[in-house]
Amino acid sequence: MRKDIYESPLSSRYASEYMLHLFSPDMRFQTWRRLWVALARAEHELGLPITQEQVDELAAHITDIDYEVAEKREHEVRHDVMAHVYAYGKAAPSAAGIIHLGATSCYVTDNADLVLYRDGLKYLREQLLSVMVNLAAFAREYAATPTLGYTHYQPAQPVTIGKRATLWMQDFRSDLEELDFVIGSMRFLGCRGTTGTEASFVDLFEGDGDKVDEMNRRIAAEFGFEKCFSVSGQTYPRKADSRILNVLSSIAQSAYRMANDIRLLQHDRQVEEPFEKNQIGSSAMPYKRNPMRSERICSLSRYLMADAANAPMTASTQWLKERQILAANRRISLPEGFLCADAVLRLCQSVTNGLHVNEKIVERTLREYLPFLATENIMMEAVKRGGDRQELHEKIRQHSMAATARMKEGEPCDLLDRLAGDPAFGMTREELDRVMEPKLYIGRCEQQVLRFLDECVPLLRDAAAEDGAIDL
């Protein structure tokens, strides 16, 4: 690997081999050649003067791309598609004269992009399901484990660790639903000609529109698409790119939210992401256990959310047909969006697969604040015993402020002692201690977790079947 030129960190550090291969020059230009073969085959089968031998020769040279020839030709003609038509013709000379017959550049560029994007989305779906399976197992394990809740990042009523995980998982489920919609609604461009009129193919087939439709149907089916866009210009509608980057951005939003929560919880040592035996947290502070994976998820997710802004700007400025100035943006923003989403989900898998809960710290943190959280129940019990609700509310406020001030000086919380010593409440310390059971304050968290997981089982069953250790 050369070290004297820039290389995107998405390629060198973060993305998977699958995604790197999917958006590689080999995959892109081989897909172009597959499209040229499919076009020639359909034209031959529908009666155009193309021989089976020409089709076979094209098919025999899909993978042996001479990049040196193509690059030299592009330098001369300044056109990538025509450069590859030329290189393909050199490899398959008997078919050189019929390559790209009737087509325009977007026949190969746009249809190839749609194939790669669809395959990329399907791969990301698998990665997303894996994250959800991990979270489902984690949520089930800790469905009933109380933990301190937060609002405004201030202590609030308890929840359970599993309930918190289902909130993350619910975001990812929303992404999965959106992803399935985008994949299911993808269409092929087909053979549309320079402005989408199919005029060149109408001419080739001597006005037989049915043959043009059949040609499009056959080529689309060969690449796994059931339908083509009903109408288009030379390019497929760039709103499709917006849909794709929007769903990738949505995944990034969910991942960022989860990873940011984990970072906050790791600060208090309640939860920790995986930490390798020989991992170094800081070059200057050897004791550090930085949440590196979660930080990286947030960093890459931020990039992906920003990257998604490219697609709507492209879709909204077509100028009657796509301008070349926009094509350059797409060559960067879409592949990098896929690579970034891949990296984010791989990191999410790593974190959720080894997320560790320090249960003693979770319990200690909750019990530190539990006296304050229990005051509403204490107040209601005191009212039952004849107290005045408004007077008791004020007394609890005063005692709470005093106890908090004491805690700020490093002293333990003495709120329960203060309430036990106040005759307005008429309760002993032993009676107050009995309401300090955390599970009294988690409401229906456990039932909510289990119900949510039951809803998700149909979505996760296929992914979970690959791992017998996961009980859904």
Model-derived segments and spans:
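Active/binding-pocket-proximal capping segment
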Residues: 272, 395-401
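Long, amphipathic alpha-helical stalk/connector segments used for oligomerization, subunit docking
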Residues: 303-389, 395
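A conserved active-site cap/scaffold subdomain adjacent to cofactor or substrate pockets
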Residues: 235-270, 274, 279-340
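Alpha-helical transition-metal enzyme core signature, strongest for iron centers
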Residues: 78-81, 92, 128, 132-135, ...
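Glycine-rich cofactor-pocket loops
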Residues: 140-162, 272-288, 321-329, 353-373
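Active-site-adjacent "gating/activation" loops or surface patches in catalytic cores
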Residues: 209-234
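A helix-coil-helix interface module used to build multimeric assemblies
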Residues: 1-202, 207-218, 281-282, 292-296, ...
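Short beta-alpha connecting loops at secondary-structure transitions
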Residues: 20-24, 69-71, 279-299, 321-336, ...
